[in-house]
């Protein structure tokens, strides 16, 4: 993993110095990252390295509670419209002249639409936002209440109750979606009391208000009251409620569309200083799909959870729906007294948020601690490796058993006309337990379907209300035939058996969920999957390991050498914060071994450097010299000292990148691209044939283009010297964008550590010299770019072989890495050798090649293939132009010749004799 570290000019081998330096670096890093503690961390605005999760919302705790309270009161119109209707059933039946059973059908139809309508509302809310759909629901609700207050027949009552349900029920699913938008999984139970405050108060306040209204003002006043209440809640949404949908506003830092802002947001003239966090935006659905809720129910887990919650709600509905009629028949209570009897149900639901719902959060944190998961305030918990079902449903099944027993007790108490006090206490306990169970199931459904929070809320709403409507429709006739005691017993037994014993054997469960029996047995015994469990020797949790990785990369960025001592010191610091023992001696080595994805493979190690060629410098020519002179005499062509630069890269696996040649000049000439060189060779031009910062960037782009498809790992290492053109700002940005790590060699060490200098450039120049010797033998002693390219091609193919490249890296001690060899090479005194001057015999070159050269591009870089294509296009254009011009000239010359012939015939006096034949 340390392949990307940068060597320095002064290397210390003292272990004490290394340990002291690493300790200081780790202390600085810990000081600059206070959030590294693997405990409950206060909220802030940035991402937390202990969890790797960003801040979930910019809203403060008070703002979250305020938003949830407004949304919950808006959602209260649905249960409020249901419960206020209970005391007026008898009065409406009497005034309309129909039976109570028919009026009960309006309650069943209300619940059916209460389940179906949210599927449409949720689909539009996930696309266009929560706030617009709240307002649409309220407009529909207003129209229905006005009609209900003015109607006079049963059919109109039935239709308008369905419309009222359509407008009111959508708000319940929207409130659930708002809760998922601004609260995390670990904190959802704590905020549920605010998110469901309105919907909890509605069922037990509604009957009281309905009873008072029907007693003193008549049953029509109930619907006028609902209209007024809905107007107040709609004004709260219009004035105070801001958009929360994460596909639109993200974590709240992104402003919504102008038409989707609250009245306070539109009136506010201040400009927010918050920087929009675009990363918090979730994928937005292109169009609403009302069938999304049904598609979610098609999933087995969602279906089982929804049906379980629906059956519990059906049992609850069977209790509350017949309570009013039973109290009036058995205890002769009036509407007000019946309404007051619903108060224990409401108080029980409120108390549930201080008992059973808090128990849900406690169980979540307990399971997270067992599984090594860090819970951080205002940050979403990663559940990819977390047993979420056990955390949410660990306490549910015992509570279902207790709730079923209480339901049976309630039925037989009513059957034997027991005193009212134990009946109300039983209802109070049922409300406490049932609210906790229902919220646990709803939280689990929301957790596993976070991106479709509104749709999954509508799916659960659909299931429970359809089952509740069926229970309400059946419970009346069943009470008459079997009595309320047996009705409650059958309902409780059915709910308990389906929820706890629906799948009798593990063999059957394995067949249903398509898993092996052995796997299912291990899961039932509490054994986790191998990919989800940590070895016993693994002291650090995943988040702590990520902190160490960040620390190592930080050391590398600042130029320090990450060592095993540094890794061990950082790990011990993290463990000491939670009372853990230090890591073992071999832990750093094993840590690096297990984090292979952060290392750089040998196949992804590259080196590049420049080499210069002076085209006027050619090799041996025949000359008379002293017999004792050693070596091959050289001759320099005085008329041509043009410089050519080669920028070459090689890979440690034994292959070379296409050459990048820099010529002196202003334009790319067509003749260069007529030579027989590969199409992927690149040619650039500069004023003097040397490399520049711009050319360095162009070569880096050439390198990225050539090596992107050949990378084995996720990182590439590029080794080069410290020339200015190698580390310009643009070059560093390109390397960072493409995950390229750079390794600068110490000054004056490239001849010792650069693989190209060690084993490639020397053979290349010798091979090039032999090619020029061959040209001399053919009487070509003036070398231009046109002679250089084919000669260089032959020399390159002979010298850049796989064996030479591999031996170059091996000789430099880089691949395979041999630190001792590298350090021993650096421990030398660098001397500058000044060769003695030697006279050179002047000579006169022959006439150079006179091949026609055309300018095809100014500046920039062209590969051989691009040059050929440009040249071919220009030649085609010139040929077309030439043919058009020649055609015009030919026709002009023909007309002139004809005129001269006629003039000559007339002058000779023979025009009359030849006129006929001419014509």
Swiss-Prot record:
The chain crosses the membrane at residues 69-89, 132-152, 192-212, 222-242, 303-323, 333-353, 393-413, 418-438, 465-485. Disulfide bonds: none annotated. Glycans are attached at residues 104, 260, 461, 915. GO terms for cellular component: plasma membrane. Its main location: membrane. Residues 865-886 have a biased composition (Basic and acidic residues). Residues 887-896 have a biased composition (Low complexity). GO terms for molecular function: nucleic acid binding; transmembrane transporter activity. Residues 1-33, 840-897 are annotated as: Disordered. Gene3D superfamilies: MFS general substrate transporter like domains, Ribonuclease H-like superfamily/Ribonuclease H. Residues 641-809 form the DDE-1 domain. PROSITE patterns: MFS. Residues 1-11 have a biased composition (Polar residues). It is found in: Membrane. Belongs to the major facilitator superfamily. CAR1 family. MFS-type transporter; part of the gene cluster that mediates the biosynthesis of squalestatin S1 (SQS1, also known as zaragozic acid A), a heavily oxidized fungal polyketide that offers potent cholesterol lowering activity by targeting squalene synthase (SS). This is MFS-type transporter clz9. It comes from Cochliobolus lunatus.
């Amino acid at each position: 993993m340390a392949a990307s570290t940068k060597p320095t000019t002064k290397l210390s081998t003292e272990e004490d110095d290394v340990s002291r330096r690493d300790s200081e670096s780790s202390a600085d890093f810990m000081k600059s990252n206070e959030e590294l503690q693997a405990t409950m961390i206060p909220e802030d605005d940035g991402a937390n390295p202990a969890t790797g999760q960003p801040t979930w919302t910019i809203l403060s705790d008070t703002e979250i509670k305020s938003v949830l309270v407004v949304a919950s009161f808006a959602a209260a119109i649905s249960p409020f419209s249901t419960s206020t209707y209970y005391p007026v059933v008898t009065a409406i039946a009497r005034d309309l002249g129909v039976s109570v059973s028919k009026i009960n059908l309006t309650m069943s139809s209300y619940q059916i639409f209460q389940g179906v309508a949210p599927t449409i509302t949720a689909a539009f809310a996930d696309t266009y936002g929560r706030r617009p759909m709240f307002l649409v629901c309220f407009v529909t609700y207003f129209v229905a209440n006005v009609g209900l207050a003015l109607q006079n027949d049963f059919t109109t009552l039935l239709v308008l109750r369905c419309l009222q349900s359509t407008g009111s029920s959508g708000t319940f699913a929207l409130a659930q979606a708002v809760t998922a938008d601004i609260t995390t999984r670990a904190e959802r139970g704590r905020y549920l009391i605010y998110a469901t405050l309105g919907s909890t108060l509605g069922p037990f306040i509604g009957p009281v208000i309905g009873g008072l209204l029907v007693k003193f003002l008549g049953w029509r006043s109930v619907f006028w009251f609902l209209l007024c209440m809905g107007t107040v809640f709609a004004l709260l949404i219009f004035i105070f409620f801001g958009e929360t949908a994460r596909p639109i506003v993200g974590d709240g830092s992104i402003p919504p569309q102008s038409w989707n802002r609250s009245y306070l947001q539109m009136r506010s003239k201040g400009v927010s200083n918050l920087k929009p966090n675009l990363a918090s935006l979730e994928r937005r659905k292109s169009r609403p799909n009302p069938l999304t809720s049904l598609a979610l129910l098609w999933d087995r887990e969602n279906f089982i959870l929804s049906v379980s919650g629906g059956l519990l709600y059906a049992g609850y509905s069977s209790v509350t729906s017949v309570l009013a009629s039973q109290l009036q028949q058995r205890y002769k209570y009036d509407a007000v007294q019946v309404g007051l009897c619903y108060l224990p149900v409401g108080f029980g639901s409120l108390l549930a948020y201080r008992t059973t719902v808090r128990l849900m959060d406690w169980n979540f944190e307990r399971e997270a601690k067992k599984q090594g998961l860090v819970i951080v305030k205002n940050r979403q918990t990663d559940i990819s490796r977390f047993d979420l079902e056990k955390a949410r449903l660990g306490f549910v099944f015992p509570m279902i058993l207790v709730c079923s027993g209480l339901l049976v007790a309630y039925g037989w108490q009513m059957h034997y006309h027991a005193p009212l006090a134990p009946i109300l206490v039983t209802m109070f306990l049922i409300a406490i337990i049932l609210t906790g169970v229902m919220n646990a199931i709803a939280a689990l459904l929301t957790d596993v379907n976070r991106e479709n929070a509104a749709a999954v809320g509508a799916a659960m709403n659909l299931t429970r209300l359809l089952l509740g409507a069926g229970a309400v429709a059946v419970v009346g006739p069943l009470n008459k035939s079997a009595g309320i005691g047996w009705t409650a017993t059958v309902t409780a037994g059915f709910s308990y058996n389906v929820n706890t014993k629906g799948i009798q054997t593990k063999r059957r469960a394995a067949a249903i969920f398509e898993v092996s029996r052995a796997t299912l047995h291990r899961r039932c015994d509490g054994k986790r999957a191998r990919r989800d469990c940590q070895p016993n020797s693994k002291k650090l949790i995943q988040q702590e390991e990520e902190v160490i990785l960040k620390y190592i990369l930080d050391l590398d960025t600042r130029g320090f050498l990450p060592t095993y001592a540094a890794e061990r010191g950082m790990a011990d610091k993290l463990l000491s914060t939670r009372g853990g023992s230090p890591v073992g001696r071999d832990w750093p080595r094993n840590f690096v071994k297990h984090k292979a994805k952060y290392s750089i493979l040998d196949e992804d190690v590259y080196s590049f450097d420049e080499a210069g060629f002076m085209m006027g410098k050619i090799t041996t020519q025949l000359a008379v010299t002293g017999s004792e002179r050693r070596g091959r005499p050289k001759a320099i062509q005085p008329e041509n000292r043009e410089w050519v630069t080669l920028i070459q890269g090689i890979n440690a696996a034994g292959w070379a990148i296409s050459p990048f040649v820099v010529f002196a000049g202003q334009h790319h000439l067509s003749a260069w691209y007529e030579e027989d060189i590969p199409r992927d060779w690149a040619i650039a031009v500069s004023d003097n044939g040397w490399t520049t910062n711009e050319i360095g960037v162009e070569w880096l782009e050439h390198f990225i283009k050539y090596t992107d498809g050949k990378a084995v790992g996720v990182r590439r290492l590029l080794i080069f010297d410290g020339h200015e053109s190698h580390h310009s700002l643009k070059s560093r940005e390109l390397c960072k964008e493409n995950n390229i790590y750079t390794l600068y060699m110490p000054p004056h060490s490239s001849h010792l550590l650069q693989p190209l200098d060690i084993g490639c450039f020397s053979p290349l120049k010798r091979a090039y010299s032999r090619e020029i010797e061959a040209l001399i033998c053919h009487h070509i002693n003036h070398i231009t770019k046109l002679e250089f390219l084919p000669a260089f091609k032959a020399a390159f193919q002979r010298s850049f072989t796989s064996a030479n490249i591999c031996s170059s890296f091996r000789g430099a001690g880089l691949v395979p890495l041999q630190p001792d060899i590298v350090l021993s090479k650096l421990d030398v005194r660098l001397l500058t050798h000044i060769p003695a001057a030697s006279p050179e015999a002047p000579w006169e070159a022959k006439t150079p090649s006179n091949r026609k050269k055309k300018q095809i591009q100014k500046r920039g870089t062209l590969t051989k293939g691009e040059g050929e294509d440009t040249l071919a296009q220009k030649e085609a254009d010139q040929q077309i132009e030439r043919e058009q011009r020649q055609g015009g000239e030919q026709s002009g010359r023909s007309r002139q010749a004809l005129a001269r012939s006629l003039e000559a015939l007339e002058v000779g006096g023979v025009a009359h004799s030849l006129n006929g034949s001419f014509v």
